[in-house]
């Protein structure tokens, strides 16, 4: 008995208004039947390949390369298709062309004597690769991915076989005509971009696009134009969202971070933030101060600065750091419920003796020059500092590019995501020592587990979108800063952020940040199951996917925790963490055959990738192998399609029994 025969007239009467609306899209029995056939066919295709990346931290070249080579999938497919029929050097050339078509074509033109012959060979090779990567999709989906100007021609090439002599001649004529009409360059570029697009069906960024590295704005440009992606906000992303919302403490933090790593590109080139007022203030205020402890970490910088510029960045770094401490104290005083009064540390300095006094113990200060700090009122901004804060605030609030990128972060992002039974969030779900969910009080009401992350998500959106001057907006603006460094914030979940201690004190013990219980308890399978149940991520193949804490692979730490229930995939995209991790990042890949982790070696440079064919060396580890290939019907999208099919079957019954008339 079919599902349709179970649909009775009585069962569809309640849905009649909806079915009448549906009939506008499918006005006849033939239309509805055709759509049912199409959707049933889609359900039985293999699921698309999902890629999970986290903690990119502005490393745009490595990030873009991983997207272009699909974490090694393109190279693997080229090897599968051409095997021993191409030499290794030829396969490497083809892969480089697929990754960087515009640049590679120019190099080929400079060296190739018979360009038309190269075009002919290359176009045939690209057609084979394209046929392979498009084979798991419907023709309709592939068609929607095609560039308009070449849509018809690419469809002809993809869906015709060259085995039959007539078809072989037909394909050759198409390719020859592309070459003779001088369209080969554009066509090759279109084919390469299509291969890149079809190899990754969906992309999940599990937080921390921003800070440390040089090109977060370039990563955001790439994402804003990407075909299918989502973002789970990280603590560094939240900091920039707070800055874009107008929180001056967040603004000071993002500037300080840029100075610390010597990467000003995102601020100045990306968002047009005017740092001249800060430079002028810093030069005047710290003219005779060596500011030694504020020297940027130049081994991670995007530019080789001359001595004069380096000196200026060092002064600016100190200036904005002191301003940050003052601005944060204003929030701490305004929000005693945050319980962060112990982070007001300027008042604990004995300025006369140059020591820091904390809990009865004295610590020598590494820097004792505080020209803008009044010992009697250490958190009061000087008139010059207040004016500077206003100027920088104006610059952040009027950056159109920043607004565009923040809208993208809000539209495609959130605190967490449940996708195909996987639960994605950047850092933590706060827990008590016994493993129960920690109850966190926000404005007098307690939240925990999923409700806590939902509330945080709502407050972050309120901070950015709500009307100025509203009480809810003011609280949300302060809370977005708390999300960055608050002890009970799910994106931080440590007892303190020891920024002051790391700058000013030598003692390593006082610099330690004690992690919340989540970070140890997540190694237990029962705890992970409890969290998965809380968020409705059900099924035998459900997992938690985290970033935030770098996996110290070099020390033997494994990214897989809790008997395979949880994956931590921060492998060190950020160059600052590569000495700790020993590698340069992970990609988690979830395809129809199962899950695998791709471990990346450091990326040399885009230039070397183009000129020398240097790919990222990646190692694959199978984490989970499906005994039966996973189909679209097994995914979240499949569940949606099943519901659509059921509705269309109801519409068919409504047509056939006369409840709705066909519109022939």
UniProtKB/Swiss-Prot annotation:
Catalytic activity: beta-D-fructose 1,6-bisphosphate + H2O = beta-D-fructose 6-phosphate + phosphate
Organism: Bacteroides thetaiotaomicron (strain ATCC 29148 / DSM 2079 / JCM 5827 / CCUG 10774 / NCTC 10582 / VPI-5482 / E50)
UniProt-listed HAMAP family: FBPase_class3
Entry EC no(s): 3.1.3.11
Alphabetically ordered keywords of this record: Carbohydrate metabolism, Hydrolase, Manganese
Family the entry assigns: Belongs to the FBPase class 3 family.
One of the protein's GO biological processes: gluconeogenesis
Cross-referenced Pfam families: FBPase_2
Known cofactor(s): Mn(2+)
GO MF terms held by the record: fructose 1,6-bisphosphate 1-phosphatase activity
The protein, known as: Fructose-1,6-bisphosphatase class 3
Pathway listed: Carbohydrate biosynthesis; gluconeogenesis
The organism's place on the tree of life at top rank: Bacteria
InterPro entries: FBPtase_class3 (IPR009164), Metallo-depent_PP-like (IPR029052)
